[in-house]
Amino acid sequence: MSDIAERVKKIVIDHLGVEADKVVEGASFIDDLGADSLDTVELVMAFEEEFGVEIPDDAADSILTVGDAVKFIEKAQA
């Protein structure tokens, strides 16, 4: 797992209080990890702060899984 993926995983665990083994690439924040719409907004804000990237609202709407977040951040930092 990449450094970005590890950091995303830690943020998700900290914000949602889920077990580490549930935070996998294909895990949906809402369907698999129990996040609600406020949780997803808070996650996006945490990703922006942690990685120093801006995630526009339209992009945030397409970040549905842990893997989506990792891919967006990797692309934004490239």
From Swiss-Prot:
GO terms for biological process: lipid A biosynthetic process. The keyword Iron does not apply. Keywords: Cytoplasm, Fatty acid biosynthesis, Fatty acid metabolism, Lipid biosynthesis, Lipid metabolism, Phosphopantetheine, Phosphoprotein. GO terms for molecular function: acyl binding; acyl carrier activity; phosphopantetheine binding. GO terms for cellular component: cytosol; membrane. Pfam families: PP-binding. Pathway: Lipid metabolism; fatty acid biosynthesis. It is found in: Cytoplasm. The keyword Hydrolase does not apply. PANTHER family: ACYL CARRIER PROTEIN, CARRIER DOMAIN-CONTAINING PROTEIN. Belongs to the acyl carrier protein (ACP) family. This is Acyl carrier protein. It comes from Allorhizobium ampelinum (strain ATCC BAA-846 / DSM 112012 / S4) (Agrobacterium vitis (strain S4)).
